[in-house]
Protein backbone atom coordinates (compact mmCIF):
# COMPACT_ATOMS: atom_id res chain seq x y z
CA UNK A 1 0.00 0.00 0.00
CA UNK A 2 1.40 3.37 -1.03
CA UNK A 3 2.28 5.72 1.83
CA UNK A 4 0.25 8.95 1.70
CA UNK A 5 2.18 12.05 0.68
CA UNK A 6 0.92 13.90 3.75
CA UNK A 7 0.59 12.56 7.28
CA UNK A 8 -0.56 15.09 9.84
CA UNK A 9 -1.38 14.73 13.50
CA UNK A 10 -3.09 16.34 16.47
CA UNK A 11 -1.40 15.78 19.82
CA UNK A 12 -3.32 17.21 22.79
CA UNK A 13 -2.19 17.02 26.40
CA UNK A 14 -4.76 15.75 28.94
CA UNK A 15 -4.02 18.50 31.45
CA UNK A 16 -7.53 19.77 30.73
CA UNK A 17 -10.33 19.70 28.19
CA UNK A 18 -10.20 21.09 24.66
CA UNK A 19 -10.94 24.81 24.34
CA UNK A 20 -11.35 27.16 21.37
CA UNK A 21 -7.59 27.54 20.89
CA UNK A 22 -7.28 23.74 20.77
CA UNK A 23 -10.03 23.64 18.17
CA UNK A 24 -8.23 26.10 15.89
CA UNK A 25 -5.05 23.99 16.01
CA UNK A 26 -6.93 20.71 15.54
CA UNK A 27 -8.95 22.11 12.64
CA UNK A 28 -5.89 23.49 10.86
CA UNK A 29 -4.01 20.19 11.11
CA UNK A 30 -7.08 18.20 10.07
CA UNK A 31 -7.94 20.30 7.02
CA UNK A 32 -4.32 20.52 5.92
CA UNK A 33 -3.93 16.73 5.94
CA UNK A 34 -7.33 15.88 4.46
CA UNK A 35 -7.09 18.51 1.71
CA UNK A 36 -3.88 16.77 0.59
CA UNK A 37 -5.70 13.42 0.63
CA UNK A 38 -3.50 12.48 3.56
CA UNK A 39 -3.83 10.78 6.93
CA UNK A 40 -4.60 12.51 10.22
CA UNK A 41 -3.30 10.81 13.35
CA UNK A 42 -4.20 11.33 16.99
CA UNK A 43 -1.63 11.15 19.78
CA UNK A 44 -2.26 11.74 23.48
CA UNK A 45 0.75 13.51 24.96
CA UNK A 46 0.26 12.20 28.48
CA UNK A 47 3.87 12.62 29.60
CA UNK A 48 3.10 14.42 32.86
CA UNK A 49 0.74 12.40 35.11
CA UNK A 50 0.84 14.95 37.98
CA UNK A 51 -0.72 17.57 35.68
CA UNK A 52 -3.26 15.25 34.08
CA UNK A 53 -6.91 16.03 34.83
CA UNK A 54 -9.08 13.03 35.63
CA UNK A 55 -11.43 12.33 32.73
CA UNK A 56 -9.64 14.68 30.33
CA UNK A 57 -8.50 11.96 27.92
CA UNK A 58 -12.01 10.61 27.51
CA UNK A 59 -13.36 14.16 27.28
CA UNK A 60 -10.92 15.06 24.51
CA UNK A 61 -11.90 12.02 22.44
CA UNK A 62 -15.60 12.67 22.96
CA UNK A 63 -15.24 16.32 21.93
CA UNK A 64 -13.30 15.47 18.78
CA UNK A 65 -15.97 12.96 17.80
CA UNK A 66 -18.82 15.40 18.50
CA UNK A 67 -17.06 18.00 16.36
CA UNK A 68 -16.83 15.57 13.45
CA UNK A 69 -13.12 14.75 13.49
CA UNK A 70 -12.13 11.29 12.28
CA UNK A 71 -8.59 10.05 12.79
CA UNK A 72 -6.72 7.25 11.07
CA UNK A 73 -5.63 4.17 12.98
CA UNK A 74 -5.38 3.78 16.73
CA UNK A 75 -4.64 6.69 19.02
CA UNK A 76 -1.09 6.57 20.42
CA UNK A 77 -0.42 7.36 24.08
CA UNK A 78 3.03 8.65 24.94
CA UNK A 79 2.74 7.00 28.36
CA UNK A 80 3.08 3.69 26.49
CA UNK A 81 6.22 4.79 24.62
CA UNK A 82 8.69 5.18 27.50
CA UNK A 83 10.92 2.30 26.35
CA UNK A 84 11.57 4.05 23.03
CA UNK A 85 12.53 7.28 24.79
CA UNK A 86 14.74 5.47 27.31
CA UNK A 87 16.66 3.63 24.60
CA UNK A 88 17.62 6.80 22.74
CA UNK A 89 18.37 8.76 25.90
CA UNK A 90 20.68 6.00 27.15
CA UNK A 91 22.46 5.88 23.78
CA UNK A 92 23.13 9.62 23.90
CA UNK A 93 24.23 9.41 27.53
CA UNK A 94 26.66 6.59 26.74
CA UNK A 95 28.16 8.60 23.88
CA UNK A 96 28.54 11.77 25.93
CA UNK A 97 25.88 13.68 24.01
CA UNK A 98 23.70 13.85 27.11
CA UNK A 99 24.66 14.36 30.74
CA UNK A 100 23.17 14.50 34.22
CA UNK A 101 22.28 17.88 35.72
CA UNK A 102 21.64 18.48 39.43
CA UNK A 103 21.02 22.23 39.19
CA UNK A 104 18.06 23.54 41.17
CA UNK A 105 15.63 26.14 39.89
CA UNK A 106 17.12 28.62 42.34
CA UNK A 107 20.60 28.09 40.89
CA UNK A 108 19.28 28.86 37.42
CA UNK A 109 17.41 32.03 38.34
CA UNK A 110 18.60 35.03 36.40
CA UNK A 111 19.69 33.14 33.29
CA UNK A 112 16.42 33.81 31.38
CA UNK A 113 15.89 30.11 30.68
CA UNK A 114 19.26 29.71 28.91
CA UNK A 115 21.21 26.96 30.63
CA UNK A 116 24.71 28.20 31.63
CA UNK A 117 26.32 24.76 31.54
CA UNK A 118 27.14 24.32 35.22
CA UNK A 119 26.90 20.50 35.05
CA UNK A 120 28.15 20.05 31.49
CA UNK A 121 31.43 18.42 32.48
CA UNK A 122 30.65 17.46 36.07
CA UNK A 123 30.14 13.75 35.42
CA UNK A 124 27.15 13.40 37.75
CA UNK A 125 25.27 10.13 38.09
CA UNK A 126 21.95 10.10 36.21
CA UNK A 127 20.18 8.96 39.37
CA UNK A 128 18.02 11.69 40.91
CA UNK A 129 19.15 14.13 38.23
CA UNK A 130 17.75 15.74 35.12
CA UNK A 131 19.28 14.72 31.79
CA UNK A 132 20.30 17.45 29.35
CA UNK A 133 21.39 17.19 25.73
CA UNK A 134 24.52 19.07 24.66
CA UNK A 135 23.76 21.64 21.98
CA UNK A 136 26.23 23.00 19.41
CA UNK A 137 27.14 26.65 18.98
CA UNK A 138 25.12 26.71 15.78
CA UNK A 139 22.08 28.47 14.38
CA UNK A 140 19.15 26.32 13.30
CA UNK A 141 16.53 27.73 10.96
CA UNK A 142 13.49 26.54 9.05
CA UNK A 143 10.88 27.99 6.73
CA UNK A 144 7.45 27.90 8.29
CA UNK A 145 4.54 27.84 5.86
CA UNK A 146 2.78 30.68 7.69
CA UNK A 147 5.32 32.40 9.93
CA UNK A 148 8.15 32.50 7.38
CA UNK A 149 11.80 31.93 8.25
CA UNK A 150 12.48 31.29 11.94
CA UNK A 151 15.94 30.84 13.40
CA UNK A 152 17.57 30.25 16.76
CA UNK A 153 21.19 29.99 17.87
CA UNK A 154 21.00 27.01 20.20
CA UNK A 155 24.09 27.86 22.23
CA UNK A 156 23.16 31.50 22.87
CA UNK A 157 19.37 31.32 22.93
CA UNK A 158 18.68 27.90 24.44
CA UNK A 159 21.65 26.23 26.00
CA UNK A 160 21.70 22.52 26.77
CA UNK A 161 18.05 21.58 27.32
CA UNK A 162 16.33 18.95 29.43
CA UNK A 163 15.27 15.71 27.76
CA UNK A 164 14.37 13.91 30.99
CA UNK A 165 13.30 15.63 34.17
CA UNK A 166 14.75 14.98 37.60
CA UNK A 167 11.54 13.14 38.56
CA UNK A 168 12.12 10.69 35.69
CA UNK A 169 9.46 12.09 33.34
CA UNK A 170 10.51 12.49 29.73
CA UNK A 171 10.54 15.95 28.21
CA UNK A 172 8.27 17.05 25.39
CA UNK A 173 11.16 17.88 23.04
CA UNK A 174 12.48 14.32 23.11
CA UNK A 175 9.16 12.50 22.94
CA UNK A 176 7.66 14.56 20.13
CA UNK A 177 10.66 14.05 17.83
CA UNK A 178 10.77 10.30 18.42
CA UNK A 179 7.03 9.82 18.01
CA UNK A 180 6.57 12.03 14.96
CA UNK A 181 9.27 10.01 13.19
CA UNK A 182 7.89 6.67 14.41
CA UNK A 183 4.42 7.59 13.14
CA UNK A 184 5.77 8.86 9.82
CA UNK A 185 4.44 12.39 10.30
CA UNK A 186 5.36 14.59 7.34
CA UNK A 187 3.47 17.78 8.23
CA UNK A 188 3.37 19.33 11.69
CA UNK A 189 0.61 21.91 12.11
CA UNK A 190 0.39 23.44 15.60
CA UNK A 191 0.24 26.69 17.56
CA UNK A 192 2.80 29.47 17.20
CA UNK A 193 3.77 29.11 20.86
CA UNK A 194 5.86 26.12 19.73
CA UNK A 195 7.88 28.03 17.14
CA UNK A 196 10.89 28.31 19.44
CA UNK A 197 10.71 24.59 20.25
CA UNK A 198 11.22 23.73 16.60
CA UNK A 199 14.97 24.50 16.31
CA UNK A 200 15.61 22.24 19.30
CA UNK A 201 13.60 19.53 17.59
CA UNK A 202 15.52 20.04 14.34
CA UNK A 203 18.72 19.40 16.27
CA UNK A 204 17.36 16.18 17.78
CA UNK A 205 16.17 15.07 14.34
CA UNK A 206 19.69 15.68 13.06
CA UNK A 207 21.23 13.59 15.85
CA UNK A 208 18.85 10.74 14.98
CA UNK A 209 19.31 11.02 11.22
CA UNK A 210 15.62 11.77 10.69
CA UNK A 211 14.00 13.67 7.81
CA UNK A 212 12.70 17.14 8.62
CA UNK A 213 8.90 17.50 8.47
CA UNK A 214 7.16 20.51 6.99
CA UNK A 215 6.02 23.00 9.64
CA UNK A 216 3.00 25.29 9.84
CA UNK A 217 2.47 27.28 13.04
CA UNK A 218 -0.97 28.87 13.28
CA UNK A 219 -1.62 32.05 15.27
CA UNK A 220 -2.37 31.53 18.94
CA UNK A 221 -5.80 32.55 20.14
CA UNK A 222 -5.25 34.88 23.08
CA UNK A 223 -7.20 36.49 25.88
CA UNK A 224 -7.42 40.29 26.29
CA UNK A 225 -4.44 40.19 28.69
CA UNK A 226 -2.30 38.57 26.01
CA UNK A 227 -2.22 35.09 27.54
CA UNK A 228 -3.07 32.26 25.19
CA UNK A 229 -6.30 30.37 25.69
CA UNK A 230 -5.28 27.37 27.73
CA UNK A 231 -6.10 25.01 30.52
CA UNK A 232 -3.92 26.85 33.01
CA UNK A 233 -5.94 30.04 32.44
CA UNK A 234 -9.31 28.34 32.97
CA UNK A 235 -10.35 28.70 29.34
CA UNK A 236 -13.87 27.26 28.97
CA UNK A 237 -14.08 23.77 27.46
CA UNK A 238 -15.75 23.34 24.09
CA UNK A 239 -19.50 22.86 24.60
CA UNK A 240 -20.96 19.68 23.15
CA UNK A 241 -23.86 21.46 21.41
CA UNK A 242 -21.92 24.23 19.64
CA UNK A 243 -19.88 22.26 17.10
CA UNK A 244 -21.11 24.00 13.95
CA UNK A 245 -20.85 27.64 15.11
CA UNK A 246 -17.48 27.09 16.78
CA UNK A 247 -16.04 25.26 13.76
CA UNK A 248 -17.16 28.17 11.59
CA UNK A 249 -15.56 30.60 14.03
CA UNK A 250 -12.34 28.59 13.93
CA UNK A 251 -12.40 28.74 10.12
CA UNK A 252 -12.70 32.53 10.36
CA UNK A 253 -9.72 32.62 12.74
CA UNK A 254 -7.77 30.71 10.09
CA UNK A 255 -8.81 33.15 7.36
CA UNK A 256 -10.71 30.51 5.39
CA UNK A 257 -13.69 31.24 3.10
CA UNK A 258 -17.15 30.57 4.48
CA UNK A 259 -20.50 29.71 2.94
CA UNK A 260 -23.39 31.50 4.65
CA UNK A 261 -25.46 28.33 4.33
CA UNK A 262 -22.99 26.43 6.53
CA UNK A 263 -24.58 27.90 9.66
CA UNK A 264 -27.36 25.34 9.24
CA UNK A 265 -25.02 22.45 8.47
CA UNK A 266 -23.70 19.65 10.62
CA UNK A 267 -20.15 19.50 11.96
CA UNK A 268 -19.32 16.94 9.29
CA UNK A 269 -20.64 19.23 6.55
CA UNK A 270 -18.57 22.15 7.84
CA UNK A 271 -15.45 19.98 7.86
CA UNK A 272 -16.16 18.71 4.34
CA UNK A 273 -16.56 22.31 3.14
CA UNK A 274 -13.33 23.26 4.90
CA UNK A 275 -11.42 20.41 3.24
CA UNK A 276 -12.65 21.36 -0.24
CA UNK A 277 -11.73 25.03 0.20
CA UNK A 278 -8.63 24.79 2.41
CA UNK A 279 -5.95 27.34 1.56
CA UNK A 280 -3.06 27.64 4.01
CA UNK A 281 -1.92 30.82 2.25
CA UNK A 282 -4.97 32.59 3.72
CA UNK A 283 -3.98 31.94 7.34
CA UNK A 284 -3.12 35.27 9.01
CA UNK A 285 0.65 35.67 9.22
CA UNK A 286 0.48 36.56 12.89
CA UNK A 287 1.83 34.99 16.07
CA UNK A 288 -1.44 35.59 17.91
CA UNK A 289 -5.01 36.74 17.44
CA UNK A 290 -7.14 38.09 20.26
CA UNK A 291 -10.23 35.92 20.56
CA UNK A 292 -12.52 38.93 20.91
CA UNK A 293 -11.44 40.16 17.45
CA UNK A 294 -12.67 37.01 15.70
CA UNK A 295 -16.07 37.87 14.20
Swiss-Prot record:
Cofactor stoichiometry and binding remark: Binds 1 zinc ion per subunit.
Family matches, as InterPro entries: Glu-Q_tRNA(Asp)_Synthase (IPR022380), Glu/Gln-tRNA-synth (IPR000924), Glu/Gln-tRNA-synth_Ib_cat-dom (IPR020058), GluQ/Sye (IPR049940), Rossmann-like_a/b/a_fold (IPR014729)
- Cofactor(s) listed in the protein's UniProt record: Zn(2+)
Origin: domain of life: Bacteria
Q: Molecular function terms in GO for this entry?
A: ATP binding; glutamate-tRNA ligase activity; zinc ion binding
Q: Where on this chain does ATP bind?
A: 231
Sequence motif 'KMSKS' region, location on chain? 228-232
Q: Where does motif 'HIGH' region map? A: 12-22
Q: What is its EC number?
A: 6.1.1.-
**Gene Ontology, cellular component aspect:** cytosol
**Catalytic class of the enzyme:** ligase
Chain positions recorded as Zn(2+) binding sites: 101, 103, 115, 119
Function of this protein?
Catalyzes the tRNA-independent activation of glutamate in presence of ATP and the subsequent transfer of glutamate onto a tRNA(Asp). Glutamate is transferred on the 2-amino-5-(4,5-dihydroxy-2-cyclopenten-1-yl) moiety of the queuosine in the wobble position of the QUC anticodon.
What HAMAP family would the database entry show?
Glu_Q_tRNA_synth (MF_01428)
The record's PANTHER family line, in alphabetical order, gives: GLUTAMATE--TRNA LIGASE, GLUTAMYL-Q TRNA(ASP) SYNTHETASE
- The name this protein carries in UniProt is Glutamyl-Q tRNA(Asp) synthetase
**Originating species:** Pseudomonas syringae pv. syringae (strain B728a)
Amino acid sequence: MKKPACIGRFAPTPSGYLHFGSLVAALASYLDARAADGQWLLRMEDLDPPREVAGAQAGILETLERYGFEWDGQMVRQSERHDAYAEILQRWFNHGLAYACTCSRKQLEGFQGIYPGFCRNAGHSPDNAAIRIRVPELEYRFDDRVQGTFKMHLGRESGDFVIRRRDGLYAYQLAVVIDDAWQGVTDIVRGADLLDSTPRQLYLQELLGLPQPRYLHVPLITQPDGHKLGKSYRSPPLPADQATPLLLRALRALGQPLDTHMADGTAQEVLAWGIRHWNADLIPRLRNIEEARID
